[in-house]
C-alpha cells in the first residue's frame, strides 16, 4: 500500500531537528534518544547497509557510534560524550582541523552578507579564489572551474580534456589499476574497482587501465593506442593512490609519465582530491617531483572541513575551449560565496601556519612509530607506508584490519579502511594534530596490536 504524503509529519520532524541544532548541549537522555533515532532513520530512510559497515569499528559489535559535534581542533565527540582523536579526517577533508576558527569565521561573515550568488551578476569571491589558485598551483595552471565534490572535479577534467582533444582526433583515456576517481559515470569509468563498476556496466567507452607505478606499461599502452588509431586524449592519475591503499609509485614515476604525455601529445590530469592542500608535506603532491599537470583536480580539504567545494584548474591553452561558450559545463552551486569563502580561508590557514611542512614533520614521526610496530608485530602487520599525513597500515588479511579499527575505537582513536583495499587501514589525521596527540596515537596502536595478539593466541 502506498504511503500518503504527510505535511504534519514532515513539519514535526524538521522542527525536532531544528530544535536539536539550536541546542548547545544535550543531556544524557536526549543523547540516548538521538542515538536510537539516528539508527532507525538510517535503517528506514538512508541505507541500512551503512549500519553494518559501521559495525566494524564499534566496541562489542554494536551499530556505529553517532557523532554529535567536533571536540577540539583534532577530535570528535559522540552522543555518549566520548571524545576521539580523529585519524580518519573525514577521508581527508579536515586538513586544517575541525571547525577551524578562521574558516568558520569567514563562512559566518559571508553568510551574514550573501549566502548564494544571483547566477547573473559577477560574484567576487569566485574571482578571488580563482586568482589565488592560479598563484598557488604549479606551472601554467591558470583558470578554475568550481563545483561541489571531487567526483565533479574529475568529471569536469574529463570533459575539458575531451573538448580540447576531440578536434585533434584523440578520444582515449588511460587510468591505472587500483585508481579511485569517484563514482559518477565518467569518473567511475576511470575508477578501477570492479565492485563499484559492475552494477553500472557498460560504462563510458574509451577508458583503459594499466598497472600503477609501471612506466613501461604506460608507454606500451600509449604506443598500442597510437598504432590502432585510438590516440590518447589524457592520462589521469593520483600522485598517491588513496583509496587504493595509500600506494606510492616509484620515485620519478610522475616525471616519466609527464614526459610520455608530452611525447604522445596526451594531456596529464592529476587527481589531487585527496593528496592536495598540504596533505603529503607539499601543498600538492606533484610538487615532490616538480611535475606540472595540464589539469589539476581538487576537493575534500579545499573547503576546510566546513563547506563542500571542488575545483578543476587548467592551463589557458586547455581551458580556452570553454571561452566561446562558458555554459558548456556549469553547476548551480559551484563557486558559491560560502564555499569560496571557506576555500580562501583554508588556503590562508595552510600558508600562514605552514601546515604542509608540519604534515611532513608529524607524518614522519607517526610513520616511524607505525613501522616500528610493524617490526614488532610481523604476524599481524605487513607494512606501514605513506607520505606526510597520508599513511596506511596494511594487515595480513581483512579481518585483522577490521579488528585493528575496532581496537583503535576502544582506544578512542578513529580510523577506517580504504575503499579499494579492505585490509589496509588509513591514517589521515588533520595536519593540525599536535605532537602529544601523535604520541597518543602511536601508544593506542601499540595497545591495539597487543590486544589483538592476545586474542589470536587465545583463539
Curated annotation (Swiss-Prot):
Transmembrane segments: none
Essential cofactor(s): pyridoxal 5'-phosphate
GO molecular function terms attached to this record: diamine transaminase activity; identical protein binding; putrescine--2-oxoglutarate transaminase activity; pyridoxal phosphate binding
Disulfide bonds: none
EC number: 2.6.1.82, 2.6.1.29
GO BP: any one term: putrescine catabolic process
Keyword Transport: no
Pathway given in the UniProt record: Amine and polyamine degradation; putrescine degradation; 4-aminobutanal from putrescine (transaminase route): step 1/1
Cited CDD domains: OAT_like
InterPro entries documented for this protein: Aminotrans_3, Aminotrans_3_PPA_site, Class-III_PLP-dep_AT, Putrescine_aminotransferase, PyrdxlP-dep_Trfase, PyrdxlP-dep_Trfase_major, PyrdxlP-dep_Trfase_small
HAMAP family the UniProt entry points to: Putres_aminotrans_3
Record protein name field: Putrescine aminotransferase
Organism: Escherichia coli (strain ATCC 8739 / DSM 1576 / NBRC 3972 / NCIMB 8545 / WDCM 00012 / Crooks)
Lineage: Bacteria, Pseudomonadati, Pseudomonadota, Gammaproteobacteria, Enterobacterales
